[in-house]
């Protein structure tokens, strides 16, 4: 949904059928960043952006194939604050990073914030390791 200059994407296991939504959010943020950078190279009108990823609880239900939700706590406010600070970067809350740290490579910015460098493709790595082990006879 949109609020002012902010666009929020809510990833909820009710819709994604995935419990690792923090990792999916980081992957999505990388794709959005790449699309914006490509736009900014091709077009005169530059898009200023910053992406913030926060993790928290929501009350959710699906009505007419649309997610209806009420955030609990400050998950939306947290994401908005991170986005405001994230000048052309992707910032993630400590809580969200800790839930996805096995696949998300990031640099700690302060006690509560991480800057995402990249998201590891575990499937690609798994295939490489399997092929390597086959070639080495193990």
Task: Write out the residue ranges for each language-model feature.
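Short amphipathic alpha-helices in soluble, non-transmembrane regions
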Residues: 24-32
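Short hydrophobic alpha-helical module
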Residues: 31-39
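Intrinsically disordered, glycine/charged-rich C-terminal tails and inter-domain linkers
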Residues: 34, 59, 66-67, 78-138
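Short loop/turn segments at beta-alpha junctions that line or gate ligand-sensing/allosteric surfaces
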Residues: 27, 72, 94-95
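Short, structured secondary-structure boundary patches
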Residues: 16-24, 110-115
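Catalytic core of nucleotidyl cyclases, primarily class III adenylyl/guanylyl cyclases
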Residues: 1-21, 38-74
């Amino acid at each position: 949904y949109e609020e002012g200059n902010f666009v929020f994407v809510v990833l909820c296991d009710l819709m994604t059928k995935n419990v690792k939504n923090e990792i999916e959010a980081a992957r999505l943020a990388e794709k959005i960043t790449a699309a914006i950078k490509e736009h900014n190279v091709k077009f005169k009108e530059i898009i200023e952006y910053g992406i913030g990823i926060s993790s928290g609880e929501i009350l959710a239900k699906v009505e007419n194939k649309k997610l209806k939700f009420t955030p609990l706590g400050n998950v939306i406010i947290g994401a908005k604050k991170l986005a405001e600070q994230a000048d052309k970067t992707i910032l993630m809350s400590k809580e969200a990073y800790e839930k996805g740290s096995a696949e998300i490579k990031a640099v700690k910015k302060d006690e509560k914030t991480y800057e995402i460098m990249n998201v590891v493709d575990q499937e690609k790595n798994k295939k490489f390791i399997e092929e390597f082990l086959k070639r080495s006879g193990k």
